[in-house]
Amino acid sequence: MQSLGCDVAALNTVQFSNHTGYRQFTGTRVSASEITDLYRGLKQSYLDDFDMMLSGYVPGAPALEAVGEIAKELKEKAQARGKPGSFFWVLDPVMGDNGSLYVAQDVVPVYKGLVQYADLILPNQFEAELLSEVKIVDMPSLTRAISVLHERYAIPHIIITSVSLPDAATTVSSTMPNSVPGSSAPTPTPQEEGQGQSQPPRTKTLSVVGSTMTSARQPRAFQISFPAIDCYFSGTGDMFSALMLVRMREAVYNTEGGLTERESWLSDDSVDALDLPLAKAAEKVLASMHEVLTKTAEGMKGRVQRAKGFVDEQLQREKAMTDGVNGCGHANGHETGQDGHVDKKPRLDSTQTTMTTTTNGNSDGDEDGEKTEERIKEEEERRRKQMEEAEKEEEVQARKRLHLMKSKAAELRLVRHLDSLRHPKVEFRARRIECS
């Protein structure tokens, strides 16, 4: 947001060392009282003259309620000044994905109570299902979920992200037709249907579906499809919501007719879905997203290899210091070959293979020998199990290290690609969805 000209007052809801996608992190969650206290400090210094607010991940219900109170207070202040369009709340209802919650269960009803105060919400497909209580399985159920959100909560603007439907299009083109009658499948041109005309390669796609309601709370829906990049990234949701805030404001201010003075920046009912500021903003946001993600993915393999080499060297140094391998014939009972390779096979000392015998004519020596053999076998079995456990643990740690290296390599390369944020080339256009 700062790179696009916004003065930002960041109020953290968590203090984590890194993105939770790393599967390990340190830090603390900010309490509701701390959030309230920080905002009180801003007000005391007259630093609460905000035009917009973006709220994202809030881990607990009390903290979420505190964030909601801040937003409601800012909206009430704008209303009291007689300038309802002077404050705009973008709410990303972060609750879960792919059918699973990653917040506490009591967070869901709090979001259901807050979305009615938001101007724009950015749920993913799973979160839209939670809020609308409509299972999204195809385009008709998706448009029904949008209608419910408009009608039940009076949410002015909605963008549903990461939409993937069974009947969705698998071919993406920047020249797709502008109308989608209840389905995301593109209509083929006569040339495409003609004899001998080659078809474009079929590519897995994702979509975002957006809508701005009319004065009667009816949807004006559109869809933007784009090719999915088969790669894991850290921070895409945060990037999308931040860009939507900036580009929505930009699109509204570029619209004539005093839209900036209207509550929730709602366009006239006569404005077509494809001409909505929301649609224009989403096109530009996805252009930036696709460029940055593509450039991040291009260098990811090399970054993983460099990180792996660095970690391997560090592990070798630590092992050399711990085991005393350098200049020693063996370490911790493991044989070291001429090439420096540590042989992890169990080594038995000569004393362990010595059998006791007697010459007094009885069988005590044989019995002692049998017991010794049993002890040797037990010791060998114990060491074998220890070695197997050590190897399994090493495999687990190796997979963990690889995930951490991939996660680091998957961090979005934002600073290196500022031009993609500021001046993206819009390639994927919105298409109208006819809602029944």
Annotate each language-model stretch with its function.
Residues 25-160, 166-169, 184, 195, ...:
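Glycine-rich phosphate/dinucleotide-binding loop and adjoining beta-alpha-beta core of small-molecule
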Residues 259-354, 360-436:
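Charged C-terminal helix
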Residues 179, 183-184, 350-356:
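Intrinsically disordered, low-complexity serine/threonine-rich segments
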Residues 102-221, 227-231, 248-282:
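Conserved phosphate/ATP/ADP-binding segment of small-molecule kinases
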Residues 17-26:
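N-terminal transmembrane-helix/juxtamembrane module of multi-pass inner/ER membrane proteins
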Residues 226-245:
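Short glycine/threonine-rich catalytic loop with a Thr-x-Gly-x-Asp
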Residues 242-253, 287, 291:
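Short glycine/serine- and small hydrophobic-enriched flexible loop segments
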Residues 2-18:
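N-terminal glycine-rich anion-binding loops that anchor highly charged ligand groups
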